[in-house]
Amino acid sequence: MKITGARVIVTCPDRNFVTLKIETDEGLTGIGDATLNGRELAVASYLTDHVIPCLIGRDAHRIEDIWNYLYRGAYWRRGPVTMSAIAAVDTALWDIKAKAAGLPLYQLLGGRSRDGVMVYGHANGRDIEETTDEVARYIEMGYRAIRAQTGVPGLASTYGVSSDKMYYEPADAALPTENIWSTEKYLDHVPKLFDRLRDRFGFDHHLLHDVHHRLTPIEAGRLGKSLEPYRLFWMEDATPAENQEAFRLIRQHTVTPLAVGEVFNTIWDAKDLIQNQLIDYIRATVVHAGGISHLRRIADLAALYQVRTGCHGATDLSPVCMGAALHFDIWVPNFGVQEYMRHTEATDAVFPHAYSFASGYMTPGDVPGHGVEIDEKLAAKYPYKPCSLPVNRLEDGTLWHW
């Protein structure tokens, strides 16, 4: 089965998405997500100018060979743009292969390892009580795992907190907005949130928290220690992961489980953290870590060290990514949890999908392929809109991690 054509579709139904569609001489098509928040056009250009010309005429079934051709042949390996482009090709080819077999994608990976995929939602509020009420709402919707973020007194804005509780989108302007950050105020306030949540809801539900790379290792150790009484499912992105030895210092100070990896692109980004057992959950994604083919390698390595998966699944990844991730999740033996932020109605209309949510779990559906398509006519009604992620400054004006 030969690849006869491929094209990039950029659309913005409430936020920007980049989709690669591959066509074959047997009439089968497949799609893959290539969205890189705030850098969408860089990936679109990479695909159009450098990848698609190399795909035409190749055997669509030779997924592994094509993956290595795009990775090894480029010489300039790794990086979010390259790996997001490769991921789009990989996901589209797995979609085609599963459609050709007449099977849902997870069957080609090895079949189900579980009946459903536990997902966590995002509860947030301007203050602790508002966040607490949002957690209650997620519990009413059936969620068993909930990420909790709250506004911090004295800060005009805080990561993960939005006026629209269900559809959080931080990329809010053509040029980056500048936010003010205070580590001291944050460290003082966050334990109070989880004290309130456990006091109201007890320990029947999993609670998670995203630090979003904002702490130094010793500050992260302090936060993890202060959160131990509340038995979090995980503390996410406690410190920038470029310095992987930092997680050793955090480990020495707390038993709060650690999760990291949404910005990772290859197994090499995760190898030392996994092999040294410095993390408990690896959050690499289908889109930014080279597709299902490469994510399997990361998960296989993690399984050797009892590290579980917790794939990133925010709304800056399209339903195409979510569909593929759920097929991966329902198969992967060392599954932990899947992030699930609901897309808007406009996005779901552009990307009709087979996956569904019920009682805290999701299933990918059983249609052939990964179960997500794109309505190109509808997508064309939502042109690209320049949007950038914010930046942070400390109260004295120093640029800080966002």
Curated annotation (Swiss-Prot):
GO terms for molecular function: magnesium ion binding; mannonate dehydratase activity. The active site is at residues 159, 212. Keywords: Carbohydrate metabolism, Lyase, Magnesium, Metal-binding. InterPro entries: D-mannonate_dehydratase_GalD (IPR053379), DgoD-like (IPR034593), Enolase-like_C_sf (IPR036849), Enolase-like_N (IPR029017), Enolase_C-like (IPR029065), MAND (IPR034587), Mandel_Rmase/mucon_lact_enz_CS (IPR018110), Mandelate_racemase_C (IPR013342). SMART domains: MR_MLE (SM00922). Coiled coil: none annotated. Its EC number is 4.2.1.8. Mg(2+) binds at residues 210, 236, 262. Its cofactor is Mg(2+). It catalyses: D-mannonate = 2-dehydro-3-deoxy-D-gluconate + H2O. SUPFAM superfamilies: Enolase C-terminal domain-like (SSF51604), Enolase N-terminal domain-like (SSF54826). Binds 1 Mg(2+) ion per subunit. Substrate binds at residues 37, 122, 262, 283, 312, 316, 339. Pathway: Carbohydrate metabolism; pentose and glucuronate interconversion. Pfam families: MR_MLE_C, MR_MLE_N. The keyword Kinase does not apply. The keyword Zinc does not apply. The record marks 314 as: Important for activity and substrate specificity. One of its GO terms (biological process) is carbohydrate catabolic process. Belongs to the mandelate racemase/muconate lactonizing enzyme family. GalD subfamily. This is D-mannonate dehydratase. It comes from Rhizorhabdus wittichii (strain DSM 6014 / CCUG 31198 / JCM 15750 / NBRC 105917 / EY 4224 / RW1) (Sphingomonas wittichii).
